[in-house]
Amino acid sequence: DILIADDLEQAIRESDIIITVTLAEEPFVKAAWIKRGALIVQMATLEVEYGVVTNADKIVVDFWDTIKHRMASTIAVMASEGLVKDEDISASLGEILSGKKTGRDNDDQVIYFNSVGAGILDLAVTTRCYREALKRNVGTWVPYWV
C-alpha cells in the first residue's frame, strides 16, 4: 500500500521500502529510523545520512564507477572521503540480475541501493518509446532544433 504520511520519521520507521528522489542538500533520512529488513533506494543527491550506508548489511549499486565520478550522492561523497571503498560494495544490480551475486539473503537484511542510471539506459528506453509511438501513430512532434 502507498499512503500519504504527515510524519517523515514515522513513515520511514514503518516502511519496508524507502525511495528517495529529491534535490535535497541535507540528509533527511536518519539511520536510526531504518528498520531491519528495509530496502533503501537512493536515486538522487544527499537525502540519507552516512549511517544509512554504513549500517546497511549490503550495499548495491547500478554503476559504481559512474557514481564515484558524478559525486552526486551520499555514497559518492563517502567514497571521496575514504569512508566507502570498492570492496565495501556487495554487488552491482547487473551482478544480482545475472545471478553472479545474491541480493537479499534473509528477511532481516538492510539493503542500501544507489542508482544513478546511465546514458545508454536512457537512450535504450527513449528509443523503445519512440518506436512504439511510431508503430501506434501517437505522439506529438516537438521542434527541438529550430
Where are the regions that the model predicts?
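Rossmann-like adenosine-cofactor binding region
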Residues: 2-83
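Adenosine-phosphate binding glycine-rich loop
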Residues: 53-146
